[in-house]
Amino acid sequence: MIVTEILGNVHDDAGAALVGDRHREQVHLEGSALVKRIQRLRTDHGNEYGLRLPAGSPDLRDGDILTVDDDDEGERGNAVIVRVLSTDVLVISARSLREMAFVAHSLGNRHLPAQFFDADGPFGRDAMVVQHDHTVEDFLRAHDVPHERQERVMDVPFRHAEHTH
C-alpha cells in the first residue's frame, strides 16, 4: 500500500476519534526521517508501506495517522501511527542574554541546527537545544555554560539549512 496523505493525528480530538478502538500498528522513525516525503516504512508488526506525500506536505509528526482500515466483515481493523524515536540532545540554558549570544554565535559557526524554546515551552525554561555532539559538550563545559544531556522526542526535526559563504 502507498500512503499519499496524512489522515490526522492521534494527539488531536478528530484524529483520536478516527482511530477509535482500532488496533494500532506503529512506524518508529528517527527525527531525520520526518522530513522525507518519499520512503519505505515498516510497522512494528512487520507490515511494509510506501510513503509518497505531495511536494509541499508538512513534515511528519509523532502521532500522525497513515492508514485506518476495517476488515472484510466491517469490523474495525488497524490504524498505522507514526511514533518518533527520542533524540540525544543537549539542552543549553544560558544564564544571560550575553552568554546565550556567545553560545549561539559559536555553535552557529559550526552550522549546527538548533531549536529555541522559551520558559513556557516543553523544557520549562529558556533553552537552546542541539543534537548531542561530544565536541559541543566539551565546548560548553570549557566555558562553564549550564547544559544538560537528555533523550527527547522533538516535535520538530532538526534540519540542516543550505548556505554559502
From Swiss-Prot:
Q: Which SMART domains match?
A: UreE_N
What's a single GO CC term here?
Answer: cytoplasm
**Which cell locations does it reside in?**
Cytoplasm
- Listed as disulfide-bonded, the cysteine pairs are none
Query: Which Gene3D superfamilies does UniProt cross-reference here?
Result: Urease metallochaperone UreE, N-terminal domain, UreE, C-terminal domain
Predominant location: cytoplasm
Gene Ontology annotations of biological process type = protein folding; protein-containing complex assembly; urea metabolic process
UniProt keywords (A-Z) are: Chaperone, Cytoplasm, Nickel
- TM region(s), chain numbering: none
Instruction: Provide any one GO MF term from the record.
Output: nickel cation binding
- Which superkingdom heads the taxonomic lineage of this protein's source? Bacteria
Q: Which InterPro entries does the entry link to?
A: UreE (IPR012406), UreE_C_dom (IPR007864), UreE_N (IPR004029), UreE_N_sf (IPR036118)
Read off the NCBIfam families from this record. Answer: PRK13261.2-3 (NF009757)
This chain's function reads: Involved in urease metallocenter assembly. Binds nickel. Probably functions as a nickel donor during metallocenter assembly.
Q: Which family does it belong to?
A: Belongs to the UreE family.
Q: What is this protein called?
A: Urease accessory protein UreE
- What is the name of the gene encoding this protein? ureE
